[in-house]
Amino acid sequence: MSLPATFDLTPEDAQLLLAANTHLGARNVQVHQEPYVFNARPDGVHVINVGKTWEKLVLAARIIAAIPNPEDVVAISSRTYGQRAVLKFAAHTGATPIAGRFTPGSFTNYITRSFKEPRLVIVTDPRLDAQAIKEASYVNIPVIALTDLDSPSEFVDVAIPCNNRGKHSIGLIWYLLAREVLRLRGALVDRTQPWSIMPDLYFYRNPEEVEQVAEEAAAAEEGEEEEVKEEVTEGQAEATEWAEENADNVEW
């Protein structure tokens, strides 16, 4: 698929894709994913063609940008590593996020409270999000999916070949997808100008690590406050001693 020059993969984006291990696929290759295989390593891991990944990512972004109402786009991730990325993608593009368990009947049972009628569905893993893809096929909703080389591709209209198991790879794909959508909508005018949002914002963070960092920051603040109090106390004590000495030396 040939793209206009403005959509070409830049060296910076290629380095990001490689650094996040987006190109590392599975050992097994599904028949529909064979065109995306670049090579195979001696250990059996297949390498994904990053150029193909970028082409499909741009195609997906153009489809998303063509939806007039951003809320009609539903971003889904049952995988833990993709839930933060889905929420950030929805916050930046205006899409509707479903992070966590997908409630069966959300697309087909209009009686349920979580019923939705989207025009486009984006999933992180076709295997874990199979229920959403199946229901989308019942009501003729197109599906965009992040697919590994061994992922099933039934009822998937646009497959973005990538490593959909690593937290950095998943976060980076959602980040690049959001950035390209904003550029196509005109929110980011100049394509040469970098986006102010960093990819790290889309990466999964362990709640225990976040709590530990918060506790360390709170302990550091308490230590600084205690040091300030000690300095103030020492200063007051010195001032009191100086006043007493001067009072003794005063001759009335």
UniProtKB/Swiss-Prot annotation:
Bias kind Acidic residues: ranges: 213-229, 241-252
Molecular-function annotations in GO: structural constituent of ribosome
Positions of post-translational N-acetylserine modification: S2
Region named Disordered: 213-252
PTM description: N-terminally acetylated by acetyltransferase NatA.
UniProt keyword annotations, A-Z: Acetylation, Cytoplasm, Ribonucleoprotein, Ribosomal protein, Ribosome biogenesis, rRNA processing
One protein family per Pfam: Ribosomal_S2
Alphabetical list of Gene3D superfamilies matching this protein: Glucose-6-phosphate isomerase like protein, domain 1
Compartments in which it is found: Cytoplasm
Disrupted-gene phenotype: Reduction in growth rate, a decrease in free 40S subunits, an increase in the amount of free 60S subunits and a decrease in polysome size.
Gene Ontology BP, a term: endonucleolytic cleavage to generate mature 3'-end of SSU-rRNA from (SSU-rRNA, 5.8S rRNA, LSU-rRNA)
Classification via CDD domains: RPS2
Location, primary (coarse class): cytoplasm
CC terms in the record's Gene Ontology section: cytosol; cytosolic small ribosomal subunit
HAMAP family given in the database record: Ribosomal_S2_euk
Other facts: Present with 60900 molecules/cell in log phase SD medium.
Family, per entry: Belongs to the universal ribosomal protein uS2 family.
UniProt subunit comment: Component of the small ribosomal subunit (SSU). Mature yeast ribosomes consist of a small (40S) and a large (60S) subunit. The 40S small subunit contains 1 molecule of ribosomal RNA (18S rRNA) and 33 different proteins (encoded by 57 genes). The large 60S subunit contains 3 rRNA molecules (25S, 5.8S and 5S rRNA) and 46 different proteins (encoded by 81 genes).
PANTHER family, per the entry: 40S RIBOSOMAL PROTEIN SA (PTHR11489)
Role of this protein: Component of the ribosome, a large ribonucleoprotein complex responsible for the synthesis of proteins in the cell. The small ribosomal subunit (SSU) binds messenger RNAs (mRNAs) and translates the encoded message by selecting cognate aminoacyl-transfer RNA (tRNA) molecules. The large subunit (LSU) contains the ribosomal catalytic site termed the peptidyl transferase center (PTC), which catalyzes the formation of peptide bonds, thereby polymerizing the amino acids delivered by tRNAs into a polypeptide chain.
Protein name: Small ribosomal subunit protein uS2B
Source species: Saccharomyces cerevisiae (strain ATCC 204508 / S288c) (Baker's yeast)
